[in-house]
Amino acid sequence: MASCHKESFDERVARECQEYTAKYCPAEMDENTVLDSLTYDIPQKTLTHAYRLRGSLANDSLYTGAVNLAMEEIVLDDLRESISLRPYKEAGLTFRFVYYSDQSGHKLLEYFFTPKDYGQVPQFQTDSIK
């Protein structure tokens, strides 16, 4: 007799990321931005959005300190306002956003945001979600 395994919250997030990536990625976000994948690191409880920048945004030399800080604020504001990411924010996940150049392949930007950054107090423990 096979045992019944109830999928944990973390397992569900990892599976949903794999399914989303397989079904929708690469996904054009705008003319210069492509979402290449969503992944979830269970031990680190980190949800990663990996993007590829192209066109005028793919230039490595564009990303100076001031541009990096401005982009960080934009990405964080988008995270704070995101309704689709609400269940993951409520669970207190860390979000990683990484951007690569379509031209050089180099990593251009990388941001990590914790509940403290995006202003969310976890409403439940992920281990207890049924």
Q: What positions do the PLM features span?
A:
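Post-signal-peptide N-terminal segment of Sec-exported extracytoplasmic proteins
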Residues: 24-54, 112
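C-terminal partner/receptor-binding element of secreted or periplasmic proteins
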Residues: 99-130
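Bacterial signal peptide processing site
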Residues: 4-7
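Mature extracytoplasmic domains of secretory-pathway proteins
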Residues: 40-90
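Short glycine-rich, low-complexity/disordered patches
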Residues: 30-39, 81-103
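Alpha-helical transmembrane signal-anchor/signal-peptide segments
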Residues: 10-21
